[in-house]
Amino acid sequence: MIFYESNFTQYLDSINRINIHKKNTELYQLFRNKPYHIIIHGPSGIGKYTQSLKFISMFSNSHLKYQKKFTITNDKSKYIFKLSDVHIEIDFLTLGCNSKNIWNEVFSNILNITHSNQYSLFFIICKNFQFIHNELHESFYSYMQTFMVNHVKFYFVINTNNISGININIRNASYILSLSKPPESIIKKISSQTPF
């Protein structure tokens, strides 16, 4: 698997070639009928982001081939977010200490995008959730409770290295999926098949 793929389909191609978390495929099929908030946790580099894309890809009409960048600029910084036909990605590592204001602006724009494009379902992938600022963390559950706005159902896919610091309300509202490091034999097999 290439470490930093440049688009969604490259991640999906890599997981279709070598999927070290095959047990999740059946679980994702169950979610197809009834999507739910999900927390995917495990050590860095284990494939949380790739598993997130695999999960939401079955809801995408374009199979995540549609990719755009969405930019928010404030007086200090410029923030770039990836957007597909079914999701947006927010990296909490890049939001910093002004994250609550940025989040409110992003969420407002998400509502506009989904309403204008008449989506019925939309996912928000929250990368590096372990870096969420305390002020935003305290109010984050209220966003998760907003399951439906303007006839659009919103679901959060949270990627984090650990769940111990996540608010109990967020954990209770989500399915928790734990990813573990594969055996050494599988890592060697993957290494031998991966072009560098």
Give, region by region, the residue ranges found by the protein language model:
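Alpha-helix C-terminal capping segments
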Residues: 28-32, 187-194
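Conserved Walker B
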Residues: 128-132, 163
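A short helix-turn-beta junction within AAA+ P-loop NTPase domains corresponding to the substrate/partner-engaging
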Residues: 154, 167-185
